[in-house]
Structures are given as C-alpha cells and as structure tokens.
C-alpha cells in the first residue's frame, strides 16, 4: 500500500495474495546492514525497565510466533521476546544451534520498516526472522545487535519514540492493540458501494478494537419496519439516503463505535452533500477494482479523489479490493487499520480535531474548522481556521 502526504492512503488487496501484502509507509530509500556489537555478558547491557509483551498470557520466557503472511514474517516458527522501552525496542531471538556463535555467523539486515535476521548453520544461512512490516519505522543506522549466551539481541531505535509498539511486527493483534492509543476513542465509518462488504468489515473491526458495532441498514429497517429494498420501491432512493443521513447525525456524537453504512445510490455516504456527520469519525472507503496491480489501483483511487464525483472520495483512507470473498473480511479490516495507523501517525492531531468538530456541532466545515458561532447558512466569506 502507498500513503500520500495529502492524507490519502491506499491499500491494494488481491485475493491471490495473503492479507496485507502491501501497506502504507513513508519509506526511506536507504538500506543498511547494521554493525554487530558483541558484549562479554548480560551485565554489559544497560537495561531500561523494559516490559515483556505477550498477546496471550504465556508462562514461558519466550513467545512462540508463527505467521503465514507472504510479506510479513518468514513462515518458520520462532521463539522471541519483545520489549518496548520508549525510544527503543528490543528483540531477543533464541538461536537454533546450541553452539556459541561468533558475530560472523549472524546477519542482521534492517531498513526503515524491514528486518531480516539470519544465522549461519552448517554452511547454510538460516532465516530466523524476516519481515517487511515492522510495527512502525526504525532508524536503521541506530540498530545494534549482540549475542547473549543462546540469544541474539537486536536493539532498534524508533523514529517515533512516543508510539508504543505492542509487538515487533504489524499484525491483526498488534494493530488492534496499538490503534487504541492512536484513535483516542474516535469512531470509524465504513463506506463503499457494497452494503455487505461494509457490514462484514465493520464487524471485524468492532470485535478487534472492542468498539460497539452499529449498522445503519439494521437501524433503518428496525425503525421503518420494512426492508431497504421495499423502502426504495415505495419512496425512492432519495428518501432512504435522507433517512440514513438522520441516523448518522444521531450517531455522530458517539465514541468508540464502528459504523457500517449503506452502499449504492441510496446510501448517504455516496452523496457528497451528505458527509456533514461522517466527518465526525475516520472514514474507510472499501472499493472493488478491476486493476491488476497496485500502481493501477493507486492511480484509480487518486483520480476518484481528485474528481470528487462521488461522496466516497471524501474518505480518509481507501482500500482497493481485487475481488471479494466474505472469508477475507478480517484481512480487509486489518488493511484498513494499517492505513488508518499511517494516516494518524502522519498527523497525530487528527483525533483531537475530530473531537473538536463534534463539539462544535458537525457543521460541515471539515477539514478547515471555523471558529465557534460560525453559521454555514449565513457564511459570507473566508474565515480563519479554528484549532
């Protein structure tokens, strides 16, 4: 996935690939091979009150990590211990061989978002860990490693020292844990042409984040005592869109919710003039594409964003799907979180700005929020942005 400074993040998700084979990153062009630093013993390591992370409570010192992602981590199971010490993170890998290795038998290759650790054994270079999806960016030139008995210790300096890493790699578990500190309670809206896709992706997100799942289709049908299809036949799509807009207004003050919106022409999100209350949360546009490669999908999304012919182009992030399989809903949800993570990291003031927008009444002045007392119906000229 590519991320752009304009705030548009795009994920291209192909069913022929494993979930999130590309993700939003602001990549550094430099790639370095870190230099080893060998210490004589554990006492040489300056500890900084690191805590041990475990997604599940495991009594052993080491967590067992297994991943089948094509571009996340090598498929072999590895034992590791991960700690986040603020500005730095530390990874401890248990070496496969029982012999004491010399630095020349170890290879550590790192760049801004990737890490490859290999061990020479019987003349062969064995991969201990290989990922191009570290949870976030590191400073490659600050990476050091050393051997401590039967463990390889890799110490990396984070680019963003304030961001807490739940784990060394970006995964569903680390994203759902890490996004809580970034979202700060802000809600998420899933928009796009397919109501079914919106529903399934939003449910996965709600479960993962511990948010409340809300479905505008279910709310509308419960209120009207009829199906959406019957409503459209009886009163037309405009009536349904207006009704959903009212529902979104009532939900705009809610926090920690994932809202699934109606797809198609009868959905409010597809209409550019109905986004006043959608701006209260982070919006993810899930869109199917016939593009056969990531670059084509990015260009397609970029054109849609620039032309603004449909309401979906107002979304904060875009997830492009090459085909759809309901069993892959969690993969799309993970891709959505990855894009949102990069968006918020690029501008950490966004959650607070969303909150301010809600407090001022969701007046439609996103992203250039006007001062208190501004009335869109009597606006006669430009106003300074209120932050």
Curated annotation (Swiss-Prot):
Family to which this protein belongs: Belongs to the shikimate kinase family.
This protein's UniProt keywords: Chloroplast, Plastid, Transit peptide
GO CC, any one term: chloroplast
Transit peptide region: 1-71
Stretches for region Disordered: 368-387
Protein name per its UniProtKB record: Probable inactive shikimate kinase like 2, chloroplastic
Species for this entry: Arabidopsis thaliana
Pfam families: SKI
PANTHER family (alphabetical): INACTIVE SHIKIMATE KINASE LIKE 2, CHLOROPLASTIC-RELATED (PTHR21087:SF23), SHIKIMATE KINASE (PTHR21087)
GO terms (BP aspect): response to stress
Cell compartment(s), UniProt: Plastid, Chloroplast
Record field: transmembrane: none
């Amino acid at each position: 996935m590519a991320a752009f400074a304009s705030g548009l993040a795009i994920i291209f998700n192909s069913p022929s690939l494993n979930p999130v084979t590309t993700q939003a990153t602001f990549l550094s062009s430099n790639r370095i091979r870190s230099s080893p630093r060998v210490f004589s013993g554990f006492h040489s390591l300056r500890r900084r009150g690191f805590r041990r992370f475990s997604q599940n409570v495991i009594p052993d010192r080491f967590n067992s990590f297994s991943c089948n992602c094509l571009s996340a981590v090598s498929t072999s199971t590895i034992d590791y211990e991960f700690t986040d010490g603020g500005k730095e993170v530390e990874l401890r890998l248990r070496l496969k061989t029982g012999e004491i290795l010399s630095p020349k038998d170890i290879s550590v290759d790192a760049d801004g978002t990737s890490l490859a650790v290999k061990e020479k054994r019987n003349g062969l270079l064995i991969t201990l860990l290989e990922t191009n999806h570290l949870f976030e960016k590191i400073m490659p030139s600050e990476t050091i490693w050393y051997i401590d008995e039967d463990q390889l210790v890799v110490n990396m300096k984070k680019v963003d020292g304030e961001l807490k890493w739940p784990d060394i790699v970006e995964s569903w578990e680390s994203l759902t844990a890490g996004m809580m500190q970034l979202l700060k309670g802000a809600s998420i809206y899933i928009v796009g042409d397919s109501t079914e896709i919106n529903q399934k992706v939003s449910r996965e997100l709600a479960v993962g984040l511990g948010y409340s799942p809300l479905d505008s289709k279910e709310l509308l049908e419960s209120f009207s005592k009829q199906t959406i299809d019957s409503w459209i036949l009886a009163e037309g799509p405009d009536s349904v869109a207006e009704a959903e807009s009212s529902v979104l207004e009532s939900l705009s003050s809610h926090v920690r919710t994932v809202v699934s919106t109606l797809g198609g022409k009868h959905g409010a999100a597809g209409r550019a003039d109905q986004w006043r209350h959608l701006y209260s949360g982070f919006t993810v546009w899930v869109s199917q594409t016939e593009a056969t490669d990531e670059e084509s999908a990015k260009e397609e999304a970029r054109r849609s964003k620039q032309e603004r012919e449909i309401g979906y182009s107002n979304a904060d992030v875009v997830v492009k799907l090459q085909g759809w399989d309901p069993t892959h809903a969690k993969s799309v949800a993970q891709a959505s979180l990855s894009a949102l993570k990069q968006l918020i990291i690029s501008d950490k003031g966004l959650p607070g700005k969303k909150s301010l927008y809600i407090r001022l009444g969701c007046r439609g002045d996103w992203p250039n929020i006007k001062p208190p007392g501004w009335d869109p119906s009597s606006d006669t000229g430009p106003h300074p942005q209120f932050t």
